[in-house]
Amino acid sequence: SASAAMVDAGGNGGNESGTGVSGVGGVGGAGGAGGLLFGNGGDGGVGGDGGDGSSTQDSGGDGGAGGAGGAGGWLLGNGGAGGAGGAASIKVATGGLGGDGGDAGLFGFGGDGGWGGRGVDARFGAAGGAAGAGGAGGWLYGDGGAGGVGGVGGAVFSLSSGDGGAGGAGGGGGWLFGNGGGGGAAGGGG
């Protein structure tokens, strides 16, 4: 990515060894915006993984959502990429949502959408998270960002496997010039 420094990732959810509920992964931080006139938006942080469930609970922690990419500078700058969603726990849980890519300024490329978090192989299949959308290209000139790829559903040997997450939409091209970003592929079922 042509974006600025990465933002902190979300923390992982705590693991539960008793009968309580496992922690949800933290949300990744949003990328900062580019300067008033020039500058690229920062990338969004990655979402934290959900905490593992114990043998006495059927539900673990969901993966945290990825942070959104920052917008590019008003005149010239690329949008930051969205952060990837965190993975689900080893029990029934959903992968985190991918963050949306940031929009470009008047000139620049939209940031790519973050990938959806994966479901984890378990006794029950965890669903993959939906991917983030690509950011819009520059208003005058620039390509839209690509949509992220949906998270893969968790595979299991009994009961139901998890569904794959939806792919993200591609960002629109510039109002005058620019190509639209491609849509992301959906994640496969477990």
Task: Report the location of each language-model feature.
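Long, compositionally biased tandem-repeat segments
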Residues: 1-190
